[in-house]
Regions:
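N-terminal core-binding DNA-recognition domain of tyrosine recombinases/integrases
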Residues: 9-104, 209
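Catalytic-site neighborhood detector that most strongly recognizes the C-terminal catalytic loop/helix
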Residues: 160-163, 232, 239-264
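Conserved tyrosine-mediated DNA breakage-rejoining catalytic core shared by Y-recombinases
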Residues: 143-179, 245
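Active-site-proximal segment of tyrosine recombinases
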Residues: 140-141, 212-213, 222, 230-241, ...
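Short pre-functional
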Residues: 75, 125-139, 155-156, 223-224, ...
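Basic, Lys/Arg- and aromatic-enriched nucleic-acid-binding interface segment
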Residues: 87, 99-106, 110-138, 142
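Active-site/catalytic core of tyrosine-dependent DNA strand-transfer enzymes
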Residues: 172-211, 221
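DNA breakage-rejoining catalytic core of tyrosine-based enzymes
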Residues: 87-89, 100-115, 163-173, 183-187
Length: 269
């Protein structure tokens, strides 16, 4: 049947119907193309494939994060194949666990953010504000329009964010002040894509002596949100994360929080 003739194409079509992002589709297609026999790999073949993925074409070792992503893409394909009755077990079960160092998010200092907003021209100020004060990704900054600001309900609608899922971000007075007078079309002033937004933010940050990226601006929003609320579920929802495991790296305790914890631990009874 068609599934057996080209299972990878059938899987990618199913993923596309589930409205995954183009970036996810591209990455998955690239990884699945390296499988020597997508539906016929036994334990030895699976481990041999995994061994071949440990190094890049230039001979340098692949980062743990990259390997983890490759394993996840392959595992999801095989999981789909099992659901379709094409496999009886998931070959990913034979793969070793990828151990990644758990790093805490690095955020833009508040003083730097103040100067970045103060010195920016209007379009750049809006980009910085949407990242640092609304937690938007570069693709979301590029896509958001003035029509997405819902003042009646006090939210900013993020249409088809990561994974092509809509979500709402609460509006703050500070964010609205930085965005300025509303207009028509894109909030950033012109049509842009994710790469252009990320590059523009990177250039602006470097020009102002700040060794940070667009993602570090977003990390600032999530870190402040978690510090103020302590609610990881709400933080995951507002950030557009599908699970809590990826949000905990933004949980940076304030000195007051740590002091209260130390006082509680220092009491007996």
């Amino acid at each position: 049947n068609g599934l057996m003739d080209d299972p990878i194409a059938a899987h990618l079509a199913a993923v596309r119907r589930d409205r995954y992002s183009d970036a996810t589709l591209t990455a998955r297609a690239r990884i699945l193309a390296t499988l020597p026999d997508p539906l016929g790999m036994d334990r030895l073949a699976t481990l041999a494939w995994w061994e071949s993925r440990q190094t890049r074409p230039d001979g340098e070792p692949r980062a743990a994060a990259s390997l983890s992503g490759e394993k996840a893409h392959a595992a999801e394909f095989w999981r789909w194949a099992m659901r379709e009755g094409l496999l009886e077990r998931n070959p990913a079960d034979w793969l070793p666990k990828v151990r990644q160092a758990k790093t805490m998010a690095v955020v833009v200092p508040e003083g730097d953010l103040y100067r970045l907003l103060r010195d920016a021209a209007t379009p750049m100020r809006r980009m910085v504000a949407l990242a640092a004060m609304a937690g938007l990704r570069s693709a979301e900054i590029a896509a958001v329009t003035w029509a997405d600001i819902d003042r009646d309900n006090g939210v900013l609608w993020v249409r088809e964010g990561k994974g092509r899922k809509d979500r709402s971000v609460p509006l703050s007075a500070g964010l609205l002040a930085e965005l300025g007078e509303p207009g028509d079309g894109p909030i950033v002033g012109k049509a842009m894509n994710a790469k252009a937004v990320s590059a523009a933010l990177g250039r602006y940050l470097r020009a102002h002596g700040s060794d940070f990226t667009a993602h570090k601006l977003r990390a600032r929003y999530l870190t402040r949100f978690l510090a103020a609320t302590g609610d990881a579920v709400a933080a995951a929802q507002v950030a557009g994360h599908s699970d809590l495991s990826s949000i905990t790296r933004y949980a940076v305790a304030s000195s007051d929080t740590m002091r209260r914890g130390a006082e509680a631990a220092g009491r007996i009874g």
